[in-house]
């Protein structure tokens, strides 16, 4: 045995040092942005470095659809029109996980991370969520997971047979603890993968997906009268506070009140940017891959509009879906704030015009001012008096001409 070294004893003072003040570092907004970009880059490198998914059976024929919209524009309703189709694997706003994880970022700095998340999901690679979710997770880890009929049907769960209309409350009861790994298996068993997203603010960031030979992507761009969007946002209350902060680039500060209408201005600008990019000298790879839909047209003629959307995306309207669509668009009332992210049976036409009685005329004038370009481009008529506002015989949705959005459909 070797000799054990002796450790000299150190005399310790019995006097206690004075309590030190806690020092918290302060970072400038520029430093926060740099740190956030570094974090995002690390996440992207992690995602890219993982082995890619194996080619699914029939993957070459799979259709990928991105329902592109903004908050409170009827996108949850349109998402359900796709989700309930028996050939569709649907997820609602998967980029919620990116924005929640990187909430100090801005919409622009998070665009790339959101886009790469979309690509992985379209290819049924659910391992991409490792960067945004706990390692131990179930199907219920997805944001608003029960809105996906595919996650409530085999092979993900046996709550509802394929071809039947799912119900969220039943799905939550029976499928909450299903393994997360079943999402990939379910995704690969469908001919269509549809994602609904509200976190893209220009079309150019999606060009790599539109030109990607591994994808067969269609863009469904849903818009709504900005005056109706404002009324719906106000009714939703603080639900969107975190997202509002990211849209406005507040470095993680939540934003509830928006007296200067900065948010609705940005929403209008984003719709104009996207629509103009798709219709004014668009790149060749966009031909036949973009379709603009107004919520008001969907509310007035739901079956005609959904038939056109299904044809655009290669789906067929079944008798059961037709009956279900009629029922959910011919209910009563306009919905409650608690239904902010849910689709219930209500009168779609009344929903689309509720703002005409709910908003003060002075606020409508302000919206028309900050969203003048969007109103003109998307076909919404301004009002110039409170009487015009409340006169429901005055149609404020202009007809679409034969050349309107000529790039919406393939030649």
Curated annotation (Swiss-Prot):
Q: Which residues cross the membrane?
A: 31-48
Entry keyword annotation includes Lyase? no
Query: Keyword set for this entry?
Result: Carbohydrate metabolism, Glycoprotein, Golgi apparatus, Membrane, Signal-anchor, Transferase, Transmembrane, Transmembrane helix
Short name of one Pfam family? Sulfotransfer_1
The EC code for this enzyme is 2.8.2.-
InterPro entries this protein is in? Carbohydrate_sulfotransferase, Gal/GlcNAc/GalNAc_ST, P-loop_NTPase, Sulfotransferase_dom
- What biological function has been recorded for the protein in this entry? Sulfotransferase that utilizes 3'-phospho-5'-adenylyl sulfate (PAPS) as sulfonate donor to catalyze the transfer of sulfate to position 6 of non-reducing N-acetylglucosamine (GlcNAc) residues and O-linked sugars of mucin-type acceptors. Acts on the non-reducing terminal GlcNAc of short carbohydrate substrates. However, it does not transfer sulfate to longer carbohydrate substrates that have poly-N-acetyllactosamine structures. Has no activity toward keratan. Not involved in generating HEV-expressed ligands for SELL. Its substrate specificity may be influenced by its subcellular location.
Q: What is this protein called?
A: Carbohydrate sulfotransferase 5
